[in-house]
């Protein structure tokens, strides 16, 4: 009896030899992880001693900048830079480092400046980052 059919069957079902998921086959776990990552950052932003600032208080210009698809990456970089000037923000900084994989690919190059965050101002940082995360949530399917 030949072992060839059994060997071929094993090759077909072996997980190590199956095709890896590609960009055209999105992983559900990646989407879930991005959603969890956004939620974790918001939870950290809402912890005392921070006041629970409402991002509805953002001016229209800041909202427009944070919502622009071609500014998603530059805005994230602005938050990554700003978090370094804040005290006790190591957990948020760590999560922001993981967030780039959750950004959709920009279709156009940024033609304007990203969001400005007041140096060392938790409330400004918190309000703008919450709004930014909300725009990412809206743009990405869950």
Curated annotation (Swiss-Prot):
Summary of the tissues where the protein is detected: Activated T-cells, mast cells, natural killer cells.
InterPro entries membership: 4_helix_cytokine-like_core, IL-3
Disulphide-bridged cysteine pairs: 34-102
Signal peptide (UniProt feature, chain positions): 1-18
One of the GO biological process terms: positive regulation of cell population proliferation
Single GO MF descriptor: growth factor activity
UniProt-annotated location(s): Secreted
GO cellular component, one term: extracellular space
4Fe-4S found in the keyword field: no
Keywords: Cytokine, Disulfide bond, Glycoprotein, Growth factor, Secreted, Signal
Glycosylation site list: 33
Pfam family, one: IL3
Record function comment: Granulocyte/macrophage colony-stimulating factors are cytokines that act in hematopoiesis by controlling the production, differentiation, and function of 2 related white cell populations of the blood, the granulocytes and the monocytes-macrophages. This CSF induces granulocytes, macrophages, mast cells, stem cells, erythroid cells, eosinophils and megakaryocytes.
Subunit note: Monomer.
Family: Belongs to the IL-3 family.
Name assigned to this protein: Interleukin-3
Name of the gene this protein is made from: IL3
């Amino acid at each position: 009896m030949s072992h060839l059919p059994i060997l071929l069957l094993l090759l077909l079902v072996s997980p190590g030899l199956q095709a890896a998921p590609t960009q055209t086959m999105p992983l559900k776990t990646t989407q879930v992880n991005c959603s969890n990552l956004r939620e974790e950052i918001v939870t950290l932003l809402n912890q005392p001693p921070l006041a629970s600032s409402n991002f509805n208080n953002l001016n229209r210009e800041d909202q427009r900048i944070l919502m622009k698809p071609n500014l998603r990456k530059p805005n994230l970089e602005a938050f990554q830079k700003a978090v370094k000037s804040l005290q006790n923000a190591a957990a948020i900084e760590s999560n922001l480092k993981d967030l780039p994989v959750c950004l959709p690919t920009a279709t156009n190059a940024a033609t304007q400046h990203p969001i400005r965050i007041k140096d060392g101002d938790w409330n400004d940082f918190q309000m703008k980052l919450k709004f930014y995360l909300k725009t990412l949530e809206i743009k990405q399917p869950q």
